[in-house]
Structures are given as C-alpha cells and as structure tokens.
C-alpha cells in the first residue's frame, strides 16, 4: 500500500520528466546548442526533479532558467546537494563533539585518564 502511495506521489514529477525527455529527443536536436551551462538546463531539470521531487525540483529549475540571460556567465552549475536535515545535522554534530577516549590515540580527550593503566 505504501509503495502505491509513493508511486502516485512521484507521478507528477515523472510526467514532467517525460515532457522534458520529449523536448530533448525531438525539439532540441533541431536547434543549435545555445545553453551556456553544464549540465544543460534540460539535464539540470531532470536531475533536480529526480533527486529533489516536484516542488523543490521545479523551484531549482526556475532559478536556473532565470540565470539564462546575457548578464550571467554560465559555466558549471550542478543541482545543489541536499542539506542534512536538522535532526540529522544535530546528531552528527553531537557525535563529533562527544568526548571519547581511544586508548593511546591522538583523539583522546584532554584530561582523559583512560591510558590503559589501572
């Protein structure tokens, strides 16, 4: 049941990707290459929709298309990586800052008495 709901949730993004693929297959080859970005705007849109979903993917694609103007130099502009969720980031920070004692390791906490002697 859950997989059916997930498939329905992804359906609008998949439909949009299908339309972009039609453009890339039938329209784009008839035109001169004009995209000043790498990856191209259509590749960017497909990647954004696949990795970030419909709402965020459309937002990222709209920002990318807005950059397609004479005043923007273009160049390498990949889909940004996802930021860790707040809970995940807090857990990672806590794990990194938690005191730990590795016997005889340079990672041992200052003032730690876990030197192997009893």
UniProtKB/Swiss-Prot annotation:
Origin superkingdom: Bacteria
Record Pfam families: YidD
Cellular component GO terms held in the UniProt record: plasma membrane
UniProt topology in membrane: Peripheral membrane protein
Positions of region (Disordered): 76-118
Keyword vocabulary terms for this entry: Cell membrane, Membrane
SMART domains tied to this protein: Haemolytic
Residue ranges, compositional bias (Low complexity): 91-101
Function: Could be involved in insertion of integral membrane proteins into the membrane.
HAMAP family found in the cross-reference section: UPF0161_YidD
Similarity-based family: Belongs to the UPF0161 family.
Protein name: Putative membrane protein insertion efficiency factor
Species in which this protein is naturally found: Nocardia farcinica (strain IFM 10152)
């Amino acid at each position: 049941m859950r997989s059916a709901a997930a498939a329905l949730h992804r359906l609008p993004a998949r439909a949009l990707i299908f339309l972009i693929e039609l453009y890339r297959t039938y329209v784009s080859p008839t035109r001169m290459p004009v995209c000043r970005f790498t990856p191209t705007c259509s590749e960017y849109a497909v990647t954004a929709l696949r990795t970030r979903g419909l709402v965020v993917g459309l937002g990222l694609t709209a920002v990318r298309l807005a950059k397609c103007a004479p005043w923007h130099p273009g160049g390498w502009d990949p889909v940004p990586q996802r930021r860790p969720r707040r809970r995940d980031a807090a857990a990672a920070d806590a794990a990194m800052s938690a005191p730990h004692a590795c016997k005889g390791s340079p990672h041992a906490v200052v003032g730690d008495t876990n030197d192997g002697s009893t």
